[in-house]
Amino acid sequence: MEKISLDTNPDSNLYFELHKSKVEIILGLVQISHGMAEHKGRYSEFISFLNENGFHVAIYDHRGHGDRILESKIGYFGDEDGWDLVVGDLLAVHKETNRLFPNVSKILLGHSMGSWIALSALQQETLFDGVLLSGSTYPNSLDIMLQKILLKIEILRLSNKGYSTILHKIIFGGFNGKFKNTRT
């Protein structure tokens, strides 16, 4: 595995891990966009599986996740245009993998929040040969409106850099409800 730093802007500390397959015939490169409350380390077994089956893998932590949590600001994307910054990071990693492997098929895998980031990136550029979306949702208009109201209340209460246990419970509280042993 090699770490490749990218200078997208001064405060982004963006780097990605490139896990190269050692098989003779390379089938493609998979770029992984992880979900909310995740980090790149959760994909290590999957990366090994992809490598063993002929795929290089590029993976990085989104802003506010994993190695990119700055000053305990979990999930924080930025003061302004945070979503655009996260989408820009995905495209910057893609641009670099395209430079490194111009003749290899590029596949984007987005999971949960990462699928939304992937979809936003695809609205700007269609540079991938394939896209896999996992755990993606499409909330209805009422859900979006209620989420925005609750989010604004929590920002007023905690600031835009605060961590809301209320939102965490609403978003993730029911995920493991049907399982007895919920170690993840």
Question: What are the roles of these predicted feature ranges?
Answer:
Residues 108-110, 134:
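Short beta-strand immediately N-terminal to the catalytic nucleophile in serine-hydrolase-like folds
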